[in-house]
Amino acid sequence: DRYTGLAHYLEHVMFKGTDKIGTLDWTTEEPIYQQIIAKYDEMADEADPVKKEAIGKEINELTIQAGKVSVSNEFSNLMESMGGKNLNAATGMDLTYYHNSFPAFQINKWLEISSQRFLNPVFRTFQSELETVYEEYNRGQDNPWRVQYDFIQSKAYEGHPYSRSVLGLPEHLKNPRLSQLIKFYNDWYTAENMVLVLVGNVNANQISGRIASTFGRLPQKATPERKTYPDLNIKGRTQYTAKIGQYPSVCMIYKGVPAGHPDEKPLEIALALLHNSSATGALDKLSIDGEITNGSASLEANRQQGRCKIAVTPLYDENQRRFESNKSAEKKALKAIQQIANGEVEDWIINAIKTNMCREFDQVMEASENKALILLQAFINEEDLGQVLN
């Protein structure tokens, strides 16, 4: 908790090469790199703003020196040279994943370069990436939807890391330690904590040996013990109010289930009875009938905890040019929820929702990228692949 946002920072700098990729002269670059690491620790420990600024200037000078003997975008260029596309990465609540597409005949070259990426990475241009991440944070603060989402998360998962953005806390973004980023990499980027997902025109039996000789070089060691967090003990009603966004809304949070739980799919169906893409849910009907402006219902199932989120926006009265009260909108939503709980749902709607969910799954599985993400999530959530795919 002292160094939040490390997983996301790491996602950014994992594109900057290694001691072999991205360097013109590692013998010259390495001592400069070590000085940069030490200077970030020194700056983090310094409380005097003037001295901090002076250290920052030293880091800038060292970064310029390192840039003269390095090519920080060489990894991306290598991927592009073999026909690779869509090179990117993302960090979520439970994982960071790196992805791209490439021609099947380049599989051997891809395995070599991609595995090399995770061997002795060098976090070049850390200074500029810090600015990029902080700009990402600032854009989020200017977005009322993002501020509202962050507020809801902070209450929905209070006491758990899910309660905060993957970007990290602002005080940590302002006071980074490159040494902690390296420690995070060494702790968590191990063979037992990673998975390789290949989807497309590949024969697993033919390339298994090549995978073993490339990705098999990753260090095999135990990861630190994962901290566990008790789930919220929700009793009765707890209400929070904040002036966020451009118009009023009510968001009701209920304890859900983690990903892979036997009740995950039943809960998704139950929430789809309130809101779905075909607009046949109880909240959808309220919106169509002019009782509310709009409504939504969804299950957020993470690896450790889950939440049911039901949101409604009060009806806007065009004649009086004002919204109805949040209390009125909440009352209508609770009535719709109770109807579902009482089983006041026609069978055809339930069957239509299940059919639509199956159709959407089949459509998603038509794209290799989506199929890879589904397999990845199954691994992260320790789900049975047979059940996930069927």
Regions found by a protein language model. Give the residues of each.
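Extracytoplasmic/secreted cell-surface and envelope-processing proteins
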Residues: 204-208, 262, 319-321
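Short, glycine/charge-rich beta-strand/loop segments that flank catalytic centers
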Residues: 93-97, 127-139
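PPIase-associated folding chaperone regions across multiple families
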Residues: 133, 262-270, 287
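M16 family metallopeptidases and their MPP-like homologs
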Residues: 1-9, 16, 20-116, 147-171, ...
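Short, surface-exposed beta-strand/loop micro-motifs that present aromatic residues
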Residues: 87, 182-187, 236-242, 299
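Non-catalytic, conformational "gating/processing" segments within enzyme and secreted inhibitor domains
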Residues: 123, 130-131, 145, 149-150, ...
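Short, charged, amphipathic alpha-helices and their helix-cap/turn boundaries
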Residues: 173-177
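An aromatic/glycine/proline-enriched structural segment found at the starts
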Residues: 117, 121-125, 138-141, 158-166, ...
